[in-house]
Amino acid sequence: VVALVAVQSPSYLELRGRVTEVSKSLIPRVVIYSVDCGDVRVRFDALSKLLRLNTGDEVVITVSKEKPNYTKGVDYVAWGYVVGLRSGDRVGKVIISLWGYVVILESANTELLKLFNYMDRVYFKVSKLGT
């Protein structure tokens, strides 16, 4: 498993991982991605025309309170709000709404919950490695 928490600060989280599942949503043209980043699992949905990943692809996921540097037309970047912080069942979850699209960060390490507050405005970036 490729996993690395590269940067972790009060306003920035960067994770490296591998896409483990790509599935169709019940909503037309929406795809659900699952990414294993070791200590953190990330699940998110995106419009299929905007982001095309395959099982096995290596990605870097950034969640930041500041607009991250990105390459237009290559990286996927969206912004939204932290709408849920949950701890229970030995797993902490950060839930982010990107104007209807959802990102869920899950980790047994509940320190993840301390990085964000309810209704923080955050940017979500996905960069495919090796492109």
At which residue positions do the language-model features occur?
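Mixed-charge, low-complexity intrinsically disordered regions
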Residues: 2-81, 87-131
